[in-house]
Amino acid sequence: MKYIGAHVSASGGVEFAPVNAHEIGANAFALFTKNQRQWVSKPLKEENIRLFKENCTKYNFQTDYILPHDSYLINLGHPEEEGLEKSRAAFLDEMQRCEQLGLKLLNFHPGSHLNKISIEDCLALIAESINLTLEKTKGVTAVIENTAGQGSNLGSEFWQLRYIIDRVNDKSRVGICLDTCHTYTAGYDIVNDYDKVFDEFEKEVGFEYLRGMHLNDSKKELGSHVDRHDNIGQGLIGSAFFERLMKDSRFDNMPLILETPDESKWAEEIAWLRSVE
């Protein structure tokens, strides 16, 4: 079974995210548990936590299919000590918020070397950051998102994702989220080489680590390393790819999350994706 949703607003409180997801016909969703553009946010209140859990139960959202995203400011591979410590503290806070909400997954972009350290050194720092956070928390899996490889962002190549996983001590609490737009613009031709790309993912990383997907079409070309999402069927990936993915059982039983730019089309996109399953 496919679990499809979108990255919905939690404006006014995290408890509104499941309500917003229900309104677009979703059975999965993503959210920010705090302001994603601030380093520090107020702690979650007991009432917000209680209402979030109540609304998830009310609208039949299971925690396996909720994929919170961390702050865009965090860089777990930061080459400078101050930036690294700040990022690690913020990441721990994000993971603890997930614990409080009873969530099992936390999705994040791996990090950037900022042209100051080697790719391998940065990847090792990211793994170390994950290890430190997992040691201080329970029950939440760190879900690394592949990137488009824009600038000095790492995680655009499958071997880099594997490099991090290999250095994480608790393999049961690390996973991958594949973003279709990022995969395409990173240079993997999911349109013309569907089988080849996912065979390569299986060989390099392994489907046992895949914990979710972001379903986005792309405004930018294959291998452009530019991250610009488009609505399903309107970009350069096209609807045929998404139709094939919906029929592929390897993507069952995980959150499939839209981050497409026109939010008014989310209900329509979810309905279409369900219709081609």
UniProtKB/Swiss-Prot annotation:
It holds the Pfam family AP_endonuc_2. Coiled coil: none annotated. One of its GO terms (biological process) is base-excision repair. Zn(2+) 3 binds at residues 182, 227, 229. Its cofactor is Zn(2+). One of its GO terms (molecular function) is zinc ion binding. Its EC number is 3.1.21.2. Binds 3 Zn(2+) ions. SMART domains: AP2Ec. Zn(2+) 1 binds at residues 69, 109, 145. PROSITE patterns: AP_NUCLEASE_F2_1, AP_NUCLEASE_F2_2, AP_NUCLEASE_F2_3, AP_NUCLEASE_F2_4. It catalyses: Endonucleolytic cleavage to 5'-phosphooligonucleotide end-products. Zn(2+) 2 binds at residues 145, 179, 214, 259. It comes from the Bacteria. Keywords: DNA damage, DNA repair, Endonuclease, Hydrolase, Metal-binding, Nuclease, Zinc. InterPro entries: AP_endonuc_2, AP_endonuc_F2_Zn_BS, Xyl_isomerase-like_sf, Xyl_isomerase-like_TIM-brl. SUPFAM superfamilies: Xylose isomerase-like (SSF51658). Belongs to the AP endonuclease 2 family. Endonuclease IV plays a role in DNA repair. It cleaves phosphodiester bonds at apurinic or apyrimidinic (AP) sites, generating a 3'-hydroxyl group and a 5'-terminal sugar phosphate. This is Probable endonuclease 4. The gene is nfo.
